[in-house]
Amino acid sequence: MKNNNNTTKSTTMSSSVLSTNETFPTTINSATKIFRYQHIMPAPSPLIPGGNQNQPAGTMPIKTRKYTPRGMALTRCSESVSSLSPGSSPAPYNVDQSQSVQRRNARERNRVKQVNNSFARLRQHIPQSIITDLTKGGGRGPHKKISKVDTLRIAVEYIRRLQDLVDDLNGGSNIGANNAVTQLQLCLDESSSHSSSSSTCSSSGHNTYYQNTISVSPLQQQQQLQRQQFNHQPLTALSLNTNLVGTSVPGGDAGCVSTSKNQQTCHSPTSSFNSSMSFDSGTYEGVPQQISTHLDRLDHLDNELHTHSQLQLKFEPYEHFQLDEEDCTPDDEEILDYISLWQEQ
């Protein structure tokens, strides 16, 4: 009996020592043995409600914990998540956190890529000579990388140089435009002096209305031609019939222009007869040679007309002369714009 009791005590002590050593390994060999033979480890003893004879009544049983390496634990966790049924949902916190982290990392990589591409494109637009000049040599070749700060500084300086170049070019063009405006002003001064000398006898209180079948735009072209032709030719007055003067245009559709001795004639530089007539006290007409040239030009303009309309033209002094927008051709509008610009200056 005593031998049996001694053997049982020794086995219980050895098992307790083995269990403590296996539960809390202190060496690498014991840890590897536990990891290798963990599937054949003894199961913990079931709890007895009445208590064990070897343990005191007030003591709690020892809780054992298996040792598992970190890599194996992560593998088992992933396998358990993948082996779940489709209806069951995995742990939401860890999965959502990993997806949000992946999306954030992807956005950050995309942002960095766009920034790098933008700086590379900006560097391609800057000439290498400008880079060499602004970096003062520095041993940087065309394929050397420049920092983002240096790239921005070089780009700003390059833009400033381009702006200075544009300003210089605009300054030269402005000088040319000023010269053109000066020449135009001189021409307008000459034309205005000639028109003022030819309209000294005009009356501001009376206006004469003429019926004319020629449209406005050929009439204005005719006036310009007359100004150019009779600019330096003197005007000669010839006495005609005291009752009525009629001048018929060779083209049958050109109509007839007549003036009466009872009306005070008021003409302006825009009138079709002001450059070939001179008025004194009676009714006069220009030199026959000038009148023939004038009628030839009227005939030529009349042949170019496609439509004929009856227009009642009102001839006013040069200071009050205005045309409607619909009566002006593009060339006439340009001339009027130049005249208004000169008057404003």
Swiss-Prot record:
Q: Do you know which Pfam families this protein is assigned to?
A: HLH (PF00010)
bHLH domain span: 99-162
Q: What GO biological process terms does the UniProt entry carry, in alphabetical order? A: central nervous system development; chaeta development; chaeta morphogenesis; enteroendocrine cell differentiation; Malpighian tubule tip cell differentiation; negative regulation of apoptotic process; nervous system development; neuroblast fate determination
Keywords of this entry: Developmental protein, Differentiation, Neurogenesis
User: SUPFAM superfamilies attached here?
Assistant: HLH, helix-loop-helix DNA-binding domain
The UniProt regions of compositional bias labelled Low complexity, in chain numbering, are 78-92
GO MF terms listed in the record are: DNA-binding transcription activator activity, RNA polymerase II-specific; DNA-binding transcription factor activity; DNA-binding transcription factor activity, RNA polymerase II-specific; DNA-binding transcription factor binding; protein heterodimerization activity; RNA polymerase II transcription regulatory region sequence-specific DNA binding; sequence-specific DNA binding
SMART domains reported in the protein's UniProt record: HLH
Quaternary structure (record)? Efficient DNA binding requires dimerization with another bHLH protein. Interacts with da (via bHLH motif). Interacts with Bap60.
Q: What does this protein do?
A: AS-C proteins are involved in the determination of the neuronal precursors in the peripheral nervous system and the central nervous system. Also involved in sex determination and dosage compensation.
Q: What is this protein called?
A: Achaete-scute complex protein T4
Q: Which organism was this protein described from?
A: Drosophila melanogaster
This protein's gene is called sc
